[in-house]
Amino acid sequence: MKTILVILDGLSQHVAQHAMGYLHAECAHGKGHYYSLNCALPSLSRPLYECILTGVAPVESGIIHNDVNRMSHERSVFHYARDAGLTTAAAAYHWISELYNRTPFEPARDRHTDAPTLPVQFGHFYSDDGYPDSHLFEDAESLRLRYNPDFLLIHPMNIDHAGHQHGLSSAAYRNRARMADGYLSQWMPGWLAEGYQVMVTADHGMNDDRSHGGMLPEETTVPLFVFGEGFSRKAGLAPQQTELCGTLCSLLGVTHDKSVHRALLAGSAS
């Protein structure tokens, strides 16, 4: 099954539970389900990109801080999909390129990636935290239409950026979440109509000190929305962030050796 993973960087469950009106509407109409999960520690971006995409916790991967700038030593969803002959793409922050394609990031070489031998074969990568989410979703849709990827990562940054500027309990942070929900309302109906499985989550949350990295619930509790016939949409599940990689690989139908939250998947997904 073709699958889209949306990582809304820095979106705390504290805000996702009330600000994402479109996503909750789709859930209310039986097209998806909303869960929450606790992110791995430390609640920092680069370690948790690695956790989500490889299923390996930061203390095991060695990516334990944002300043650990090296390629991943683990196999990611991108690797499994590419090796199975599937097509991969990402519209994402440049740390994704550094983890799985090449490091250090060289904008002239890497910002627009068209390299079928790399794990992320096709990509639009940005390095400015203020890069507009509206443009990022357009970048993603351009990749989808041009390359027809089996696995597409969409990774906007403006929620996290607003949190670092204004904090969790700010209108700016909440409104950035609402804006991301609006962009999803523009694009996601088309994805679902074309049979995509869609997972929307966050790497970590945000606190009122305009930071994250620790163990406060607002930093560690993040949303998980799932949409599509590949998901069971069962209530009461407690998926782990380390299980998302294997669950995505199972949706894609590729051979892998990662942990899976089986109850998230419908009977047709293995």
Task: List the predicted regions and their residue ranges.
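Feature captures the catalytic ectodomains and active-site-proximal regions of enzymes
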Residues: 1-270
